[in-house]
């Protein structure tokens, strides 16, 4: 169920304080472009990136469901400023590893800011198209290899200025 309302940070803190709550995550979806330290666009499987701005990525449904498994580094936590988790495929295609910095830009043709993010984790895709338990999401045209998770602060930074006067398509 969704009211399409944004959940404020105060609401998140109030929910997290409820006795019995072990952890939480809230997501902000961003479709940015990524560039390596030489300014080159990253190689991807198809289309673009599907990024979750995250407070605590270990509680994201993609990890909780078993579709993804963190295999290197750490999850995004609420105290990280510009952390980034990428897929093993994306790391291999682009020669990336933990500690490398990528630059994300939400809409390169506009005035949205570039945000530098450090790779803090790498995940494997466990989901299998033939496995009903970890069903691959055929409803999305984004390939799981192109999913990323960035700290909420980074996601909000990517959207800074979006929708202001003279912005947009």
Mark where each language-model region is.
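Basic-flanked hydrophobic alpha-helices used for secretion and membrane insertion
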Residues: 1-169
């Amino acid at each position: 169920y969704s009211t399409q309302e944004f959940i404020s940070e105060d609401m998140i803190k109030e929910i997290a304080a409820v006795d019995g709550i072990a952890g939480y995550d809230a997501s902000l979806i961003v479709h940015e472009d990524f560039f390596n330290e030489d300014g080159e666009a990253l190689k991807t499987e198809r289309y673009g990136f599907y990024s979750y701005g995250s407070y605590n990525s270990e509680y994201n449904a993609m990890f909780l469901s078993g579709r993804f498994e963190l295999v290197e580094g750490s999850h995004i936590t609420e105290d990280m400023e510009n952390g980034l988790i990428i897929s093993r495929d994306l790391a291999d295609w682009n020669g990336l590893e933990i500690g490398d910095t990528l630059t994300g830009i939400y809409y390169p043709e506009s005035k949205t800011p570039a945000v530098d993010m450090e790779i803090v984790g790498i995940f494997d895709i466990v989901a299998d198209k033939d496995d009903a338990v970890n069903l691959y999401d055929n409803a999305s045209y984004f390939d799981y290899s192109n999913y990323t998770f960035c700290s909420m602060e980074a996601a909000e930074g990517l959207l800074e200025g979006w929708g202001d006067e003279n912005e947009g398509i």
